[in-house]
Amino acid sequence: MSAAAAGRGERLNHAGNPGHRSKYSRVLLKLGGEMFGGGQVGLDLDVVAQVARQIAEVVRGGVQVAVVIGGGNFFRGAQLQQRGMERTRSDYMGMLGTVMNSLALQDFLEKEGIATRVQTAITMGQVAEPYLPLRAVRHLEKGRVVIFGAGMGLPYFSTDTTAAQRALEIGADVVLMAKAVDGVFVEDPRVNPEAELLTAISHREVIDRGLRVADATAFSLCMDNGMPILVFNLLTNGNIARAVAGEKIGTLVTT
């Protein structure tokens, strides 16, 4: 845990009572857009509601939560490029998809009674705040969830890289990378159900072995700055709280 996190100490929940003890005080949660669609194009509102309930649980326990969501349930820039679209334009379409996901999650979090702000890297003042890291930190300190939409606002950068960069800029303790699998495997578990799950690994080894968890740029950025990544299964209810508490789930990636 960072020195800043240690200084924050045990936080109070909204009722003024000591929150559950957590390993991390401020986390960046990375959500894949494809999970928001339940494997289809568009939004699966049952999935969004379940994710919102899990996030609300840890926020009530006093943990500061920022979120980055992909847009793969609407558009994936690289795939659109393969179909003949110009890459820059298709990436911007993907960024707009992340904003739609961000607004949906904001709505369900607020239904859970959690104050939530969306900040976007592309200015769209009628629906979200602009991305301002100092303001984002102030929101977090006040117990609000902050969702970062529109990726980096630049083509050719994935939302995985956005998650790493935003985590560093807001002083998060860890990137919680939520997936539809239990963690990092030596092989694709969808191809080989007997593939070995790694409980711990270094950033360098992930990059050198070409393990396809997230893009190499995101892992390199975290490696260079000592940012741990916990890869875990979002589809198991309660796993966000388990991850924040430091329970042994998923795969912990460290320098």
From Swiss-Prot:
Residues 1-21 are annotated as: Disordered. The gene is pyrH. It comes from Mycobacterium leprae (strain TN). Transmembrane segments: none annotated. It catalyses: UMP + ATP = UDP + ADP. Disulfide bonds: none annotated. One of its GO terms (biological process) is 'de novo' CTP biosynthetic process. It comes from the Bacteria. This is Uridylate kinase. Pfam families: AA_kinase (PF00696). The lineage of its organism: Bacteria, Bacillati, Actinomycetota, Actinomycetes, Mycobacteriales. It is found in: Cytoplasm. Keywords: ATP-binding, Cytoplasm, Kinase, Nucleotide-binding, Pyrimidine biosynthesis, Transferase. ATP binds at residues 30-33, 72, 76, 185, 188.
